[in-house]
Structure formats: C-alpha cells, structure tokens
Amino acid sequence: MTRNVRVDDPTAEEATALARALATRFGERVRVFTADGDEPVAESDPAEGDVSGRPDVDAEADAGPTEREERLWDEIEDILEGGPEKYRERQREAGKLFVRDRLDLWFEGLTFEDGKFANFDAWHPNAPGTDDESEGGNGGDGDRLPADGLLTGAATFEGRAVHVAANDYTVKAGSMARHGVEKLLRLQSRALDNGKPVLYLVDSSGGRIDQQTGFFANREGIGRVYYNHSMLSGRVPQICVLYGPCIAGAAYTPVFADFTIMVEGSAMAIASPRMVEMVTGEEITMDELGGPTVHAAESGSADLVADDEREARDLAARLLSYLPDSADADPPRTEGAPPANSPDGIDSVVPEAPRKGYDVRDLIDRIVDADSTLELKPAYGAEIVTAFARLDGRPVGVVANQPAKRAGAIFPDAAEKAAEFVWTCDAYGIPLLYLCDTPGFMAGSGVEKEGILEKGKKMIYAAASATVPKQCVVVRKAYGAGIYAMSGPAYDPESTLALPGGEIAIMGPEAAINAVHARKLAAIDDPDERAREEERLREEYRRDVDVHRMASEVVIDEIVPPSTLRDELVSRFDFYATTEKDLPGKKHGTII
C-alpha cells in the first residue's frame, strides 16, 4: 500500500525527511508531492529503507530514524494509550468508546493535535528529572496524565475544517486542570481568530478539586473558558456532544454551546447526586437529576438526544450542514429536492374548522425539501415546532405553531424555545419561515407564575430584532399577540402571506362575542333564538377578521393558493436573499 502526501513547496531535504518519517510511522510506502505536482519529489519504503528524490543520498547515514526520534515515537505511542487500562475497560463496560477511538469514528484522522505532551513532566518516566525505572512522575499507573486528559486539535468533518476538543475519561475521569484548561483556551482563541466551527466532545467529571489553585479563579483559568464561549457565541458555531455524567464546570460547556446533543446514558447537573443529598437531603440518581429526559423535555437544555455514539455523530453532521463556518459566511446551500409530500395536499392538511387540531409537521413536509427537516427540542415547549429545513436547497429556520399540542397556544417554555432558535438563526444568517396558526399566548395563573409575559416578551423581541429575511404565513388563525410573536406585519417580514382560511384578530370569535355581547345574549330567554344570534354575531365577526378583508386593507401582502405555497416561498426567499437590515444604533437591547 502506498500513501500519498501533498505539501506546499517543500525543499528536497524537507520532502525526503517527511517521506522517511511517515514511512517509518505508518509502516508503508510514502510518496511526497508538491501541492500541484504530478510527480513525487520524494519517496520512502520502510521495508527496504530506500529514499528517493534527494541527490547523492548517503544510504547508511539516512537509513532511518535516530535513537532520539525513536524515543520520541515511543513517548507519543505511550501518550496515545490514554489512562490506565482498567479505566479503558470501564469505558467499554459502560458502552462508551475510548476517546481516540471516538475520534476515529468522527474523523479520518486529525489534521493535527496540539498539546499531546501537556503535563508530561508530572507522570512520564522519560520526563526530565524523573527516574527511568519508575512508572510515572508519582510512581504509579493511576497517576498517568497523558495530554492532561483533554485532546485538542483540528480535523475535517463532513468536508468542513473544524476545531475539536475531547475529554479522555480514562484520565482522572476526564477532569480538567491547569494544562488542559490552557489547551482549551488556546483552541477557543484560535477559533475566534480564524472563524471555524468548534466541536466539544464532552466526557468530564468537572475540575480537579485537588489542583484548583492552578486553574479555578485565575484570569486564564477555567472561568475564562465560559468567557470565551460567550465571545464565540454567534461568531462561530459551537456544537457539544455529551457522553457521560458531566458535573459542575463540565456542565456549563453544553449549555453555552449553540447546540447540545446528549447520548443516552449521559447527564449534566450543577452538582452530583452525592452533593445534592448532602445539601438538600434529596436522594436522587444521576439520570433523574440531569439525564437526557430531564434536559430534553423539562429544562430545554438539550437540543437532541442520540441512542448511541454513532447517532450522535450523525446528528452533529446534520446540524453542521445547515450552518456556516462563521457569522461572516453564508449558510451552505445544497441541490434542491421536491418535498416528501405534494404541495397539492396542503389545503386538505389544514382543517377548515379553526379549533380542529392537526400536526403542523404534515404541512411542513409539503413545503420543504424531502428529508431536510431536523427538529430541535421536539419534547420541550411542543406547542411550537422549531426546525432546520431546506427550501430548494436553501437552509431555513422554521418556527411553526403546533395545533396538535394544546391547540397551538403559546406557553412559556415554547416562547423561550422559539426565541432562542430565532436568535441563533439570525446570528448565523439563516432565513426564517414562520407558520402561524395560534390562538395566542396562554392565559391563567399557572402560566403567569411560569413567566408567560417575560418569556413571551423574549419571543417578540427576537422576532423584532432578527435582521435575516423573514417570511410569515398565516396558515389559519393568528389571534392576539400571537401574530406579533410569529413575526406578523408589524415585525418587518419581507412578506406576510396567508392561506385562504386565515384570520387575524385580537381574539377568537367566541371570546370576542362573550366580551362584547354577553349581556345582550343573556337577555334572550329562548335558547334557540340565543344560539341563532350567537351564530350571526360569530359570522359577522369572522367576516371582519377574514384574510380577504386583511388583504383588501393591505395588512397582508398576498393570499396564496395553498398548492403554490412552496413555490411562492422559494421565489421570495431567493429574491430577498441579499436583503440587509440595520438595527438602531445602540450597544445592545436590555432584553435577554
């Protein structure tokens, strides 16, 4: 087998040295080419020890690596083994991959790795000042600290250059200390400078408590990691995957990342179950405290849940496919595809009766490209669907009321979920498609205590502040402040479209009639006559709020035949793709 390597303009000596070193390392023939050359400038075959491409080579002098280089290779091989074998075995028993096997699953080799020798002096027998006969800096296998428990570097993922940070759980349970923190800070700083996405493969028990003096509160300590997360937010995509229980400091990276994927069996919490019991007396398991179900359905901290490590990788790949390398780049467009189901059926999917439920995902499937939808946080705030999808290959963020859940009324969790999704799409230049079919924000003492006004405000603020192209479609009902939250006419969408059954009103007919005509109706003794009068008032109200009236008053831009909705949206997103908007000059708003 022959391995070919391309290098930008190497000298003859550099090419020869590289060929020889790689041939020795990989145990196969290596040919080195210039970046655009057709013929190799150097070759090396480890079996025969021959080197070509360098004039007048002394075969004996250049027979292979020196003893010094061999010693270095031995040290590297030792580092690559990770922590003690017993901890690698525990990883296997837990159904988890060793971190370097995990990287093999994700990438065809790292482009490069930084900091393999981090904390080398503290454990390796070859370290300066260490007795060669000892097993480590402190004399035991359990003291192995290869790479200080954190791997950092760069790789190509699905054709994209990315930064990678991955905890090695075989090293002190993936805990973080001074050198690992330094590596992570450097990676984040470089990502901020060069504008490439960051993948965090997190499997960490948090900070090393016995070493906190060196990294906890320092200006360049672990606190700076979250500062850097904040600076990277909205600048380059940050995707985090959780593989095991992540406690305290380790649990902040997932929530700071733009997107978090939890593998079944993982967990994250501000404190361990033991600490929780000590502080509160509550006895609880790690899964009950912060497992995937908790964060996917109750806290909203997890965007996606994967059954296993391979699915986690596939979900991350799908996520990245919608995202640009940085806020300065355009989201990647692909070749378009027809929808999974024909747009001709849109009108039959949406019931004529305003209060009848249906699954809005059936509507989405007739609008967007087939197999292009990735719903985020599906179990959290399920009254609103937030999803990435493609329209003729263009990535879009879909925000859709879900009449199949609580009639599509907007509850606090759903409002917060939608606000965060809109904010993220806007940060990375992803256009927004709103599909509005809601009776408005939910009312009642329960939702008031849960912050419906505060969280509803965030959703409205996000719609108002988003400067990416927006299209609002009034699918059926748009009542109350729901039309504001769904980026209606007052919120500067490029277009407000409506299907023929749409209604825009302060409230629904029943509520309006009760508010305005309650006494008049109560004065009618005959039940049949009262019912007829209610129906008359209802129809009169409906005519007043019917979408045709709104189109006549130019409140909306167009009533669209349902079967043409997809084509209409494709054309409008194409036309407005280069739209630029500026917010008023200010440091930032006060709403978060």
Language-model segments: residues:
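A short, compositionally biased
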Residues: 24-29, 150-151
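Long, folded non-catalytic interaction modules
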Residues: 38-44
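A short amphipathic beta-strand at an alpha->beta junction
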Residues: 27-37
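A short, charged, amphipathic alpha-helix used as a generic interaction element across diverse proteins
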Residues: 12-25
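Hydrophobic beta-strand residues in large extracellular and virion-surface proteins
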Residues: 5-7, 22, 30-32
